[in-house]
Amino acid sequence: MKHIRNFSIIAHIDHGKSTLSDRLIQVCGGLSDREMAAQVLDSMDLERERGITIKAQSVTLDYTAKDGETYQLNFIDTPGHVDFSYEVSRSLAACEGALLVVDAGQGVEAQTLANCYTAIEMDLEVVPILNKIDLPAADPDRVAEEIEEIVGIDATDATRCSAKTGLGVDEVLETIVKSIPAPEGDPDAPTQALIIDSWFDNYLGVVSLVRIKNGSLKKNDKIKVMSTGQVWGIDRIGIFTPKQIDTDVLNTGEVGWVVCGIKDILGAPVGDTLTHAKGGCEERLPGFQKVKPQVYAGLFPVSSDDYENFRDALGKLSLNDASLFYEPESSAALGFGFRCGFLGMLHMEIIQERLEREYDLDLITTAPTVVYEVVLNNGDLLYVDSPSKLPAVNDLDEIREPIARCNILVPADYLGNVISLCVEKRGVQVDMVYHGNQVALTYDIPMSEVVLDFFDRLKSTSRGYASLDYNFQRYEASNMVRVDVLINGDRVDALAIITHHDNAQGRGRLLVEKMKEFIPRQMFDIAIQAAIGAHIIARSTVKQLRKNVIAKCYGGDISRKKKLLKKQKEGKKRMKQIGNVELPQEAFLAILHVGKD
């Protein structure tokens, strides 16, 4: 056991986590050169296309150190985006140490800080590594000082490497063996195995990634899932070298995968404990905190026949992504679907894209909203995650919106732009600290402003240099209103949005203008209105198509023309009373882009 090292690789987006993982796999011979590919751990098509890590992946490698001993390295490559921070905290729970990878050109960024603090809170050994030292812009000495000043870890002897060229990777491996402690645990105690992650395989059922804390697991063992008390037999057991390889046993301190033929999606939840059915342990391991979704949106299948498939797909996906929340919802405009909770807008995009690709579904998304705390006149407290659930105005006492504490790291040159962006987003400054050329800003900004497009705007105002990390702080009373959209006088529930009173007029006008572009012209006028309660705040009209009925009158009497025009007008009026307007998918998406341009 003293030759096992469990560690995660944590870093900000694009600081080279996945590339470093590739080099470690290559040096330790986990894959042959023929099988090696760039970012070999990013196995999802989506991850490769976007160049980001979404799922944490684990790998077991054998490394012969310079002292002649062979060490087993279990490491987990984690995502860098703030939307996937839950993946990171889960991965860290299975480790004794973490490699903090910092780009020697970019320096410390907000996500570096957030992930590093998570690791320190869990009592992990954090080992700083300066990556990308082959770049002309690299300044490792400055960055080492920055790590010490901002993060508070001594980085004077930090290992310097370039994951792309392979320079210094051997030193990284030696540092891992020397600096990261071996796992603790008792091989003879009753078995306790923590489920770090699980996914659904169409042939094998539920596959669980586990870390053995005490005891061991063997093939054909009878095991019990502690939360449900169900007993299963282990069909297959093994490790990833990134390839899935079968073994006969997993010992204390090791990380590997287990297949028990569980077909029920809820059969082995993430964060649960596995033990032997006979003579197993009594206590569960402390799992993970449940994360609260920050953004909610309705997802509806375009064709109602897909509803069952959609439900199954969501179930399988939520097994793999424990931070996804969903509950059934119905809408007059869109039929049956689900109200889903996400950690942020990127998370929402990724989930929608995964559902459409992996499960072949066509989906419509409604406007994302955050959760509001609503106080009614009779003193009752409600939590509202959808504009359609907001009670009538005369029943409301006050609406409280969630406030996010945002930590922003930005180079001093772009400070002015970033501050004006925060003010525009109704932010309140809490703190501002200079660290050399970097400025650490702390702002309290309403969550609804943060999740919509704050991240994109922050990147564009700072030319990509500013970085952001945010978490929910508190609820605060605010003047929020619901803006309804009426098409020819009928409310469309799926198009309503909740926004601040000061922005309502502007957003209402933008919304109706955007919708006008997407609704095709009909044989009658279509009035698109935005309203707060009964008060109309904006309107635009999609003009009717009309035939030139007087084309056949050559000259002739004006009364003849008037008669024909009047007849046409009456026909249009009749049509408008009975005509229905078909809203295309793009009209629903128009909401998502309001305020972005």
Curated annotation (Swiss-Prot):
Q: Which InterPro entries match?
A: EF-4, EFG_III/V, EFG_V-like, EFTu-like_2, G_TR_CS, LepA_C_sf, LepA_CTD, LepA_IV
**UniProt GO BP:** positive regulation of translation
Query: What's the protein name?
Result: Elongation factor 4
For this protein's source organism, the top of the classification is:
Bacteria, Pseudomonadati, Pseudomonadota, Gammaproteobacteria, Vibrionales
Taking the first listed entry, what is the main subcellular location of this protein, grouped into a coarse class?
A: membrane
Give the bilayer topology.
Peripheral membrane protein
Keyword annotations for this protein, in alphabetical order, are:
Cell inner membrane, Cell membrane, GTP-binding, Hydrolase, Membrane, Nucleotide-binding, Protein biosynthesis
Family affiliation: Belongs to the TRAFAC class translation factor GTPase superfamily. Classic translation factor GTPase family. LepA subfamily.
This enzyme catalyses: GTP + H2O = GDP + phosphate + H(+)
Function (record text): Required for accurate and efficient protein synthesis under certain stress conditions. May act as a fidelity factor of the translation reaction, by catalyzing a one-codon backward translocation of tRNAs on improperly translocated ribosomes. Back-translocation proceeds from a post-translocation (POST) complex to a pre-translocation (PRE) complex, thus giving elongation factor G a second chance to translocate the tRNAs correctly. Binds to ribosomes in a GTP-dependent manner.
Superkingdom of the organism of origin = Bacteria
Could you tell me where this protein is found in the cell?
Cell inner membrane
The organism is: Aliivibrio fischeri (strain MJ11)
Q: What are its E.C. numbers?
A: 3.6.5.n1
- Residues binding GTP, per UniProt: 14-19, 131-134
Which terms in the GO cellular component ontology are assigned?
Answer: plasma membrane
A GO term, aspect molecular function: guanosine tetraphosphate binding
The UniProt record lists the tr-type G domain at 2-184
Q: Where are the transmembrane segments?
A: none
